[in-house]
Amino acid sequence: MMAGRRPILVAATRQHVGKTTVSLSLMNGLKKRFDKLGFIKPVGQQHIEVQDDEGNPVRVDKDVELMKDYFGLDHLNFPDMSPVIIPRSYTKRFIDGEITAEHQYEQIRKAYDNVSSVSDQVLLEGTGHVGVGSGVNTSNAQVAALLGADVVLIANGGLGSAFDELDMNRAMCKEAGATIRGVIINKVQPDKLDMVRDYLGRLLEQRWGVPLLGVVPDLPFLS
């Protein structure tokens, strides 16, 4: 059904920059263009227990339950929406050889194939900053490259500090072979919105050839 559309992966420069909030906004926008949306959190760290379609208990990332319920994604199965969970001691097990990179990749590929086969467009939500998961070879950048996803990178704040963080995360994307297609700046002081939109927009175009897709003000009700 996807007709060759590339998935979109929402990544961030660090934790707590509003990645899930932006993902909700993007899903809401995509819903106006596509009949059936897919959502996957390829690698999750904060998991909860839910019931699958057959009533069996399964562990999924907490954001997956939110997206499934809020957008009514009844055509998707929980296990496909959250293929890899990283609980405590997971990295130790990976180093000991109990878990392999290829096994994780197979889980992620299978989940994506299942979701994309019944969806018109798929949104992937990353975990933490771009490099999170590197210790087990499943960083956001590696997952984006694995699935051929277009990366939308989110950062907080103003001008210089935001670009510094963006550039550091871009380096990890380049190393993994992932492509950044756009940037969103979240939690910008309201009186600096126009300045950030103008100057950071020009800087991104000059340095990366990438558009600034949006600038979100730091307002209490948005938090």
Report residues per predicted region.
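Flexible phosphate-sensing "switch/lid" loops adjacent to ATP/NTP-binding sites
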Residues: 1-223
